[in-house]
């Protein structure tokens, strides 16, 4: 076994340990709930033309509920905007049986497990590329990827560099988009995190406008 393979196993074990820690210690208000506590994959319409890529499942959101962007403040904000443009049938995403449906869209985290401090390491992201790739391959009608935040954006670029020999220099910007090798567009979007919302970096009007643009592009 080579050094990189052994190192990769170390990072995997670290993530699994942290995921289990979150799921057993829980947050006070969710003490009576059983946390999903496993990797969180994508959700939505596999025939869709839009793919929304987040960073990773939230510690007490996706890691608790088992569905990406579900049960936390970021998901409340995101779905309010997706409902505004009729991508989502409702403006909330609370738990897996809440009746949520999304149209023409697939949502997935770049990293399938919650990382410590919400800061994934490059090695952790690389470990998830295989799963990410299999989701890409399922989405036969994909036309546009919306990357929520710079890390998700850079991960998509890295993925295309490794799998499609993509060499263009691109830079993350809210609403800025680029053409990728297989005729898919990649658009940057500020992450709907409470920090970004509370500091005014992103608001409902801006994000709704961005998703209106996304719908026009497809």
Residue positions per predicted region:
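Glycine/proline-rich loop-helix segments at beta-alpha junctions forming the active-site rim
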Residues: 1, 110-218
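Single conserved hydrophobic/aromatic residue that forms the stacking wall/gate
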Residues: 2-7
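Active-site loops and adjacent core secondary-structure elements that bind or stabilize anionic groups
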Residues: 10
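Short, well-ordered beta-to-alpha junction loops that form the rim of enzyme active sites
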Residues: 20, 55, 147-151
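Residues lining hydrophobic/aromatic ligand-binding pockets adjacent to catalytic sites
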Residues: 23, 62-65, 141, 202
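Adenosine ribonucleotide-centric catalytic and binding domains
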Residues: 30-34, 38-96
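A structural signal for short, well-ordered beta-strand segments and their strand-loop junctions
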Residues: 52, 91, 107, 144-149
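Short, surface-exposed acidic-centric catalytic microdomains
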Residues: 77-123
């Amino acid at each position: 076994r080579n050094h990189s393979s052994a190192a990769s196993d170390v990072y995997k074990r670290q993530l699994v340990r942290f995921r289990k820690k979150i799921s057993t210690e829980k947050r006070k208000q969710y003490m009576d709930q059983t946390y999903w506590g496993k990797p969180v994959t994508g959700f939505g319409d596999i025939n869709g033309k839009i793919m929304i890529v987040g960073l990773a499942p939230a510690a007490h959101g996706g890691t608790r509920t088992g569905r990406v962007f579900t049960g936390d403040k970021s998901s409340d904000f995101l779905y309010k905007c997706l409902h505004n443009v009729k991508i989502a049938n409702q403006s909330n995403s609370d738990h897996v049986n809440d009746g949520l449906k999304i149209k023409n869209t697939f949502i997935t985290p770049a990293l399938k497990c919650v990382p410590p401090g919400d800061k994934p390491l490059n090695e952790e992201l690389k470990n998830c590329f295989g799963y990410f790739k299999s989701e890409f391959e399922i989405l036969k009608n994909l036309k546009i990827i919306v990357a929520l935040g710079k890390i998700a954006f850079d991960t998509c670029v890295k993925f295309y560099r490794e799998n499609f020999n993509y060499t263009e220099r691109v830079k993350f910007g809210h609403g800025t988009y680029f053409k990728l090798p297989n005729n898919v567009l990649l658009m940057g979007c500020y992450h709907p995190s409470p920090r970004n919302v509370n500091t005014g970096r992103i608001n409902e009007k801006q994000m709704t406008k961005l998703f209106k643009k996304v719908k026009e592009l497809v």
